[in-house]
């Protein structure tokens, strides 16, 4: 079997060295982590910053009404607790990288909540603002908005379901139960089912002049989209466009069709919103997308060394926000990227590590559980297994045409279609055997990994059919393959501890190893947010 060289942390770690003792079976931990004076003060300053963002949301137009009207708003009281889980065991540069990235992710979600409540007919009821908004799926690359600086894309499903489930593990269960009472089967993807449930029980904000829905991440989303679109069009008078991305996106023949559909979508938005597409704005956005891709690959090159710096759940969430929610439209992201890049280079130079030792180098493949996304940092601190990158962060590698010339416009439509087809997760789970299986082993080689952790989402049919192929090819290559089951956003099927137990069992029985921090192996966080 392939083995990785064990890397030892030569720096003396200040503060707490055992982290499981911080959990006491309550909603939050019994105290926050002590990191030494300097890092604790820095960490506390970011804690205060998070509260300032949440207070600003509450005080914004419609904020107080939103807290009372929508059940999902209460989940955001747990934001500081969630960020604490992402920074477990971190010191120096790794702590600052994580906070820099998550500060902006939280700020971006907070802006989404502010805009959503401001335009919502039930809370802020700002009609003028609402008429400048286009509703978009949370799972869409918002490329069709890259040339519309006059109007806003509102991803209302992000605060309602996606990010809420990261904050509190039981945030989606009510919506799942509502959907199943309505007659939707319980063995479908819980993400789309929860979105349908939120629509059924009127827990989505209502705003916007029109809406664009997509069939990404998978065709399972069509189930929820049908219910949501019906309510938007028939009850709220919000027309909806269906932007269909071909499933076999690796086939070059489908690009022309996808580009034509993108043209129709843009023309439809122009018609409904009364605005014109601006090519100058589009090419500014695509330059930022290209810069994001270059920066991401430089971070991954550092992760290919013995001293990776930017990895784990925050790496994934930052890429989600940067590519999908933003897609080059925000001018604020490049300076954040630059700041992270400086910290990554500095951390690599200083050989900064998160744990006392790194025993294994792991690629994380498949779709992670929203309610246990912090498991990647648990792996580092409990078992010394470094999650170098995850499937959802492997979005695109190519760069797109940046030159604003009329002869490049047709290519630009194809570039937008390519981005839409290759949105996060979908670019691997759909498109054929090559992009899901073969590319995994390419990343294993490029990042010098000796282990793969395969998330097995029970309700997802895309990966489950290739279970045997992954097993066989991992065996041929001498790669340790760990299967970990979950149900995406329903912790009642697989609890957090059940998820951790699967990984721990492999490390003990197959790898014959003992944990770095035994207090983390069994954590009483069943009731924790």
Model-assigned labels for residue ranges:
Residues 10-11, 20-27, 34-133, 259, ...:
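A charged, amphipathic alpha-helical module
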Residues 99-204, 225:
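An N-terminal, globular interaction/scaffold subdomain
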Residues 129, 138-177, 363-432, 436-440, ...:
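Redox- and metal-dependent alpha/beta enzyme cores, enriched for Fe-S-associated oxidoreductases
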Residues 134-143, 215-223, 365-372, 458-465:
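Gly/Ser/Thr-rich loops at beta-strand to alpha-helix junctions
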Residues 161-249, 255-257, 483-485:
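Active-site and donor-binding regions of nucleotide-sugar-utilizing enzymes
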Residues 187-205, 267-288, 415-437, 510-529:
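Extended, charge-rich low-complexity interaction segments
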Residues 375-389, 404-424, 432-522:
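Hydrophobic alpha/beta core scaffold segments
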